[in-house]
């Protein structure tokens, strides 16, 4: 499997788009990342079910999170707010990071650095982030473990994001 993904031109168009990110056409690198997230999260589900140590290492889990969070613009596409603002999404823990979702005039964009005025900040513990994005935890349980400041409704919207084909 690794040889197959390594053999593909990472920037060529993949046979299938990453639908949960709203793409009809995706680059091979994103399709390969999507495939990795599928395998990682199924392995993690099995480990959770049989009470075995997980595979939450920075090397393995951070790429999963980074791929999952590429669904943010698609997830927020119907959420309206003032242009020139951003939502800050934090996955806390050694495997986590910060993601910035910027509201441009017509759409949401994932950006590397904050732009404009912060309107919400959502902090999700790394232990449950993958479960939120793969429908592995109910909303109430997720809400009780996350922290949102600023625009609560906007900040909590990420808890409905699905980063798998469901």
Go through each PLM region and give its residues:
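Hydrophobic pocket/interface hotspot
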Residues: 1, 42, 146
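C-terminal interaction segments
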Residues: 7, 114-166
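A glycine-rich beta-turn/hairpin centered on an aromatic-Pro dipeptide
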Residues: 63-104
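Acidic/His-leaning functional-site neighborhoods
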Residues: 96-121, 125
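A short, structural micro-pattern
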Residues: 33, 40, 81-83, 95, ...
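Short, contiguous alpha-helical
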Residues: 21-77
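Short alpha-helical "patches" and their helix-cap loops
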Residues: 49-64, 82, 86, 141-153
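Acidic interhelical loop/turn segments
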Residues: 2-32
């Amino acid at each position: 499997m690794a040889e197959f993904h390594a053999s593909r031109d990472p920037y060529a168009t993949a046979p299938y788009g990453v639908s949960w990110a709203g793409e009809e056409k995706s680059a091979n690198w994103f399709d390969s990342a999507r495939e990795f997230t599928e395998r990682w999260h199924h392995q993690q589900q099995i480990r959770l079910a049989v009470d075995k140590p997980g595979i939450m290492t920075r090397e393995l889990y951070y790429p999963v999170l980074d791929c999952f969070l590429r669904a943010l613009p698609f997830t927020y596409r119907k959420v309206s707010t003032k242009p020139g603002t951003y939502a800050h999404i934090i996955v806390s823990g050694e495997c986590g990071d910060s993601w910035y979702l910027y509201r441009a005039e017509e759409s949401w964009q994932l950006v590397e650095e904050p732009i404009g005025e912060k309107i919400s900040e959502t902090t999700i513990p790394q232990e449950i982030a993958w479960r939120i994005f793969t429908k592995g935890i109910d909303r109430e349980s997720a809400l009780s473990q996350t922290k949102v400041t600023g625009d609560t409704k906007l900040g909590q919207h990420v808890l409905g994001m699905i980063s798998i084909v469901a």
